[in-house]
């Protein structure tokens, strides 16, 4: 058996199970769930793992996460193939939940399908007989950093330490026996491009802001109140006035929403709440911009005579590149779709909690097409299931084969050459230092 013969066997099994892979994606698409609430989705993944006969199936990881593994007689290295369980809020999406407004407007149903598709290809082909190591398949919760107030409540109750699922799993030492990680995101790439390789991305600090004023009759005695909404608006205007100080090369993004603007229209608002991120290309840029944002928020309160509580929360670290691992993925992408359909990765102003993993292990986050429309909008729809769900299944599986072939020669070399920014044990203290500025 040569490595190319094994790859063909893996691809045949994925093609044979094409309808199953697409069916899993479509089922998850019409049953979207928000982060740390993905109970049904987690059960779907667990059932798929059981059907494939995966070992060491674990559930309730960071509340809703689920994992399973396959291995050879040689248990290391351990490669984690990740799919994200959660949706986001997009009430206008055609497949939105009518009650919660949750919708898969970022393609996470494709991640789960391709993670399971990878597992199908490797198990049904008997690939581990010819490979050396372990493959851990992970359905990870809560990548979308949303419902910040709800998650902060979970944190205060001691149910989580971090608002992002992979962060929580890292803090809970799930990743302590993992040597490298990879996943494939879905994207709207146009008709010619099928694959975009892994790139870098922004990180951010999450923020909860609460303005406190004084109630009074909004018509009869507004002068006796302290308008917290006015204070909040001045704070937001102050942030906008800071934008010319944000350097272009730092990719700063600040995008607040008011989650509560008061209680009743005829009462001077006394309780106004804001959620926002402060994003940037580097930790230093994020810290600098965050200080400016806090000054603006405080100034709004001072101007009106209100009070403001600012809670800075661990967001996500800027994503780093792992070129050796990305090149293995690239080779397989070119072999399946041709070099003309594979684009280089770029810097993205969005963020993901896999960024935190890139500081402690080799990890990649490439994308496959198959969708149209703008991500995080009601327009984001899968229009090519083959590219969205089946192609990434093959790419993940073939990359695993390359990494674990020949006594895991390639995988071990990447691990040995990788230099972590800090250790997994040090991770818990990293965000504390960042928030202290």
Spans of model-derived segments:
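Metal-dependent amide/peptide-bond hydrolase catalytic core
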Residues: 233-437
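Divalent metal-coordination and catalytic microenvironments
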Residues: 28, 81, 108, 137, ...
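Electropositive phosphate-/nucleotide-binding environments in soluble metabolic enzymes
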Residues: 4, 8-11, 15-22, 39, ...
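Histidine-centered active-site/metal-ligand motif
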Residues: 29-31, 86, 104, 108-111, ...
